[in-house]
Structures are given as structure tokens and as C-alpha cells.
Design a protein with these regions (language model features):
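Basic, low-complexity intrinsically disordered segments
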Residues: 95, 106, 177
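Alpha-helix boundary/capping segments in eukaryotic regulatory proteins
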Residues: 94-99, 112
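Histidine-centered, transition-metal-coordinating active-site segments
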Residues: 1-91, 99-100, 120, 134, ...
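Short active-site segment of divalent metal-dependent hydrolases/proteases
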Residues: 108, 112-113, 206
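Short strand->helix junction
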Residues: 74, 113-114
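A glycine- and small-aliphatic-rich helix-loop capping segment at beta-alpha/alpha-beta transitions
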Residues: 117-128
């Protein structure tokens, strides 16, 4: 079913988040802008943040090691973020939700990731565990937007609305008040608005299709293995080959992934509409008090999503071809963490000033998490030379 034919079948307007209540509150009060909404301004602040720009130098899946040839067409955290933002805009538009809030959350959803992708995050978390701590990229993103982005004369951080800060934390998971008492202002007993719930699924749709593309492009995945292991890909690939028998393999793959993405997005829109209708929910408050999240794929499409994700983990993310990337990320991140813990003088002055309040291990993790792949390589090399 085409999205265009359903644009009038919006969700009840009272379900969409708005900035006129608690969600629009900022830590430091600001006068309203003459032309832009508060959520729109938040999106712009995220877009102009240094941490956002650094996403261009952070790995999505492929980390280019020092002796690797250039690979300019693989996705970075920044290109992935832009793809998630495009999907999220479509979802919000089709469902009649708050597009400005949705876009701000999509732009911010990966801003807390460290270098070297998930391998880097795992290594940083492992380093912190030895000090009774851990690393969570959502919570680190909150630290970035509330403190480390120091761009304004009147306040520290970006002074984002509560709605955006809550969505940054809760778009992909729920947190308990007992485990995270410091997050008390973020309504931990409530579901996030639908705008935030959709970001996690937009993220999955973007990276599933993109990682199949990058895996095939890299040669780690073969077309036949993907066809065998990902049923939804095989179905669409068969239809493309029948329709365009003369198409080159790369063109057929591109068309297949485009159709696969469209099917996932369309299914998500239709399923959210159906779940909201069946639940009888009419307001944002009812969304937030619902017993479970309402943003989900249909059972059949969820099975296809799970199969694709399982295939990627077994054949791509954990493949021998990616093992050297993971090993290098672990060596660099854990090695630099140890080096800075041994010599805190390697920290910039503004980070050292936070050690009494936060503890050395957390500040070292903050510093490393903000690095690009190339910068951490440089610093790691310098630290080894002593």
C-alpha cells in the first residue's frame, strides 16, 4: 500500500508531542523564537554541534585501519544518521506526528557513540567495568548535549528542551529509576512519545539495509549467501530480476534494498496506525501510560527483520573479515584508556577540571568517546612513543 494514498489517515492529533507543555521546558528559560519552534531550534543546535560534525569521522561498521586502502563509499556515523533522519521524517509525516521533534531526535540518536563503532563501545565499556562503571551511548549523548557542547554565553551545553533530552535517552530502551536515580526528571515511569519510539525502528531499518549493502560492497558477503539467509531480500531480488533481467548485479541489489526499505517503512506506518486504533488511545498522555511501546512492525515483518539482523550478526559483524577491525579497536581503545588513567596529564585541561566531580575513569571515557577514528589512532600512537 503506497504511503501517498494514506496521508489523510493520520493518528489523532492529540497523540503528537507538542512543545507547549512540560516537553518544551528548557533548563534555562529562553524567549520563544519569532519564526522557529523550540523543537526546530533543538534540531538546529544538534546539527551545528561539534559532536555532530565528528560523526563524519566515526565508523558505522567499517573502520579503516592504518594500512588499509581508502574506502570512501562505506557509511560513517554521519551518513547513517542522515539516512535515519530521512526515514524518520517520512514516518512522522505519514502518521501526523511532530516532525520537528522527530528530526531532532534522529539527528541526535548516535551522537554519543565512541570511535570504531560497536567494537569501540564494547571496549570502552569493558575498560570502565574494571572501575565499577559502564558505558551507554545514550547516556553519554545526554552528557554531550547538557555539558560538553560549550557554545553559548548564557549557559553550558545546548539547553535542549526536555522532550528532546528525554527522547535522546529513551528512544531505544527504558531505564529504571532505581538503577538511574540521576535521570529522575525524564519520566522513567512513562513511555516516551511516539516520535521517540519510532527513532529506534528507523535506525534498525536504515542499518539493516545499509549493512547488507556495505557487506556486499566489501566482498565479505556474497549475493548468494544473502539470498539464502535473508528471505525478504530474496523475495524482492527475485522480483527485480524478473522485471529487469538485463540489469547489472549492483543495480539489481540497489533496487532490491530500496524495495526492502520501502516495505519495512510502509509496514511500520500501517502497524502503528493499527495498534493505536485498536488500543483506543487518543492522547499523548495515554501513549505515555501505555503498558508497552506502540511503535512496532507487524509480526510477519518483525520475523523478516529478525532474520536479517541474525544473518548480519552471524555472517558480517562477527565474520573473520571483521575480526581484525574488532581486535584493533579493542587494542587502541583499551590501550589508550589505560595510558590516560596512568598519566592524566594526557587529558585536556577542561577535562582534568572535571575529575574531582566525576572521577578520573568517567572523564577518560568521556574524552575517548568524543574522538574520531583518526584522532584516536594519532593519540594512541603518540602515547606508545612516550
Amino acid at each position: 500500500m503506497a504511503i501517498e494514498s494514506n496521508l489523510l489517515a493520520l493518528l489523532p492529533s492529540a497523540i503528537a508531542a507538542n512543545e507547549h507543555g512540560e516537553l518544551g521546558r528548557r533548563t534555562h528559560a529562553e524567549p520563544p523564537h519569532r519564526y522557529r519552534t523550540s523543537f526546530e531550534r533543538d534540531g538546529a543546535r544538534i546539527l551545528h554541534a561539534r559532536a555532530f560534525r565528528r560523526l563524519a569521522g566515526k565508523t558505522q561498521v567499517f573502520a579503516r585501519l592504518p594500512d588499509d586502502p581508502p574506502g570512501d563509499h562505506f557509511r560513517s556515523r554521519l551518513t547513517h544518521t542522515l539516512e535515519v533522519t530521512q526515514i524518520s521524517r517520512t514516518l512522522a509525516h505519514a502518521l501526523g506526528l511532530n516532525r520537528e521533534l522527530t528530526e531532532a531526535l534522529a539527528l541526535a540518536h548516535d551522537i554519543g557513540h565512541p570511535p570504531f563503532g560497536h567494537a569501540g563501545e564494547k571496549a570502552l565499556d569493558h575498560s570502565l567495568r574494571a572501575h565499577g562503571l559502564g558505558f551507554d551511548h545514550n547516556l553519554h549523548a545526554l552528557r554531550i548535549v547538557t555539558w560538553f557542547e560549550d557554545r553559548h554565553a548564557a549557559f553550558r551545553g545546548l539547553n535542549l528542551t526536555l522532550g528532546v533530552r528525554e527522547g535522546i535517552i529513551k528512544h531505544s530502551r527504558d531505564y529504571s529509576a532505581s538503577s538511574h536515580p540521576e535521570l529522575g526528571e525524564y519520566f522513567l515511569d512513562l513511555r516516551p512519545p511516539l516520535e521517540a519510539q519510532l527513532i529506534d525502528l528507523a535506525d534498525e531499518i536504515a542499518y539493516l539495509t545499509a549493512d547488507l549493502d556495505d557487506g556486499l560492497e566489501s566482498g565479505i558477503l556474497s549475493l548468494e549467501r544473502v539470498r539464502q539467509g535473508v528471505p525478504i531480500f530474496r523475495i524482492f531480488h527475485d522480483s527485480v530480476v524478473r522485471q529487469y533481467p538485463e540489469a547489472r548485479q549492483k543495480i539489481a541489489v540497489n533496487e532490491t534494498l530500496k524495495r526492502m526499505m520501502n516495505a519495512l517503512v510502509t509496514d511500520l506506518i500501517d502497524e502503528v496506525r493499527a495498534r493505536v486504533s485498536e488500543s483506543g488511545i487518543k492522547t499523548l498522555d495515554e501513549i505515555r501510560m501505555a503498558p508497552k511501546r506502540l511503535a512496532a512492525l507487524s509480526p510477519a515483518m518483525e520475523a523478516d527483520r529478525a532474520a536479517a539482523k541474525g544473518f548480519l550478526y552471524d555472517n558480517f559483524y562477527n565474520s573473520p573479515g571483521m575480526e581484525r577491525v574488532h581486535n584493533h579497536a579493542t587494542e587502541v581503545v583499551e590501550g589508550l584508556f589505560t595510558a590516560i588513567m596512568t598519566d592524566p596529564g594526557l587529558l585536556p585541561e577542561d577535562h582534568r577540571a572535571q575529575i574531582p566531580a566525576e572521577g578520573l575513569a568517567r572523564i577518560v571515557a568521556d574524552y575517548i568517546a568524543g574522538m574520531t577514528d583518526s584522532y584516536i589512532e594519532q593519540l594512541w600512537t603518540r602515547s606508545r612513543k612516550g
